[in-house]
Curated annotation (Swiss-Prot):
Organism placement in taxonomy: Bacteria, Bacillati, Cyanobacteriota, Cyanophyceae, Nostocales
Quaternary structure annotation from Swiss-Prot or TrEMBL: Homodimer.
Origin species: Trichormus variabilis (strain ATCC 29413 / PCC 7937)
Recorded metabolic or biological pathway in which this protein acts: Amino-sugar metabolism; N-acetylmuramate degradation
Similarity comment text for this entry: Belongs to the GCKR-like family. MurNAc-6-P etherase subfamily.
Protein's name in the database: N-acetylmuramic acid 6-phosphate etherase
Length: 307
């Protein structure tokens, strides 16, 4: 591999010929250029769809067995991982330890630039060791340019512990090769502002993490149709969403849906089981548990037994 001090050959560091007069564009021309270039993020995800789908399947399989999902990154990549992890508990009612974000420099790096902390592979190794990663876990390394030592150290450490490793980069393998179980390359080309990977590289990373985490939760039975039936009812907005889900799927009035939601302990999935089967809260909970929380399978099983 080329000397990592020489990065000009990397796709993410190259100069975009379409934006060489960026400082001379009108505001409208600038917006049009960004809009045009951002279309490449959708194309990049499409080109990596097989690898992303494989990541969903294999990650869901590990989590079913009691594993955890970790995102590891530095700078923008790290912040995006932390963001995606933080959205899982309210959206899918997952425990905070199930999906975690690890960023070089820790929590302080979320709001203050700490890019100098990404250059120590041993820190990535230590981050994995501190979380007692095992063969049941999944570690996703996110690095736009593919060379971040913190991320590479974390992935290498996770591989040694038998974890499933996923590498996400925005440069082709011919420029930066790296060994991981699943290699996802999101090629969006040079940035409008040369080297600023918070732009297209950041956008395509966010798109991919959206798909990965949502896909995994779908496979884990956290979704019914396209409804977030495991939503955590923790504020008025989410209570309204929970009530609308119940109203739409059961035909109940809002008042009746509210009563059902309270009887279920504010768990939409359990409320639906109770409504569709006639079971009480405890029996409905046992039925869901017997089917690993999969609402569709639980209800179908109950009805197939002649109930």
């Amino acid at each position: 591999m080329a000397n990592l001090q020489e990065r000009g050959h990397l796709l993410t560091e190259q100069v975009n010929p379409l934006s060489q007069n960026l400082d001379q564009l009108s505001s409208l021309e600038l917006v049009e250029l960004f809009n045009s270039e951002d279309r490449k993020t959708i194309e990049a995800v499409a080109a990596a769809k097989v690898q992303i789908a494989t990541a969903i399947e294999q990650t869901a399989d590990r989590l079913r067995q009691g594993g955890r999902l970790f995102y590891v990154g530095a700078g923008t990549s790290g912040r995006l991982g932390v963001l995606d992890a933080a959205e899982c508990p309210p959206t899918f009612c997952t425990p905070p330890e199930l999906v975690q974000g690890i960023i070089a420099g820790g929590a302080g790096a979320l709001v203050r630039s700490s890019e100098d902390l990404e250059d120590r592979a041993e820190d990535g190794d230590a981050a994995i060791a501190q979380r007692h990663i095992t063969q049941l876990d999944v570690v996703v390394g996110i690095t736009a340019g593919g060379t971040t030592p913190f991320v590479q150290g974390a992935i290498n450490s996770a591989r040694q512990r038998g974890a499933l490793t996923i590498f996400i980069a925005c440069v082709p393998a011919e420029q930066v090769s790296f060994t991981a179980d699943i290699d996802i390359r999101l090629l969006t080309g040079p940035e409008i502002l040369a080297g600023s990977t918070r732009l297209k590289a950041g956008t395509v990373t966010k798109l991919t993490l959206n798909i990965l985490s949502t896909g995994v939760m779908v496979k884990l039975g956290k979704v019914y149709g396209n409804r977030m039936v495991d939503v955590a009812v923790t504020n008025q907005k989410l209570r309204d969403r929970a009530l609308r889900i119940l109203e739409d799927l059961t035909g109940l009035s809002r008042e009746a849906a509210g009563f059902l939601l309270e009887r279920s302990g504010k768990w939409v999935k359990l409320a639906l089981v109770m409504h569709w089967t006639g079971l009480d809260k405890d029996a409905g909970d046992r039925l869901l548990s017997a089917h690993q929380g999969n609402l569709r399978e639980a209800v179908a099983s109950y009805k197939n037994q002649g109930n």
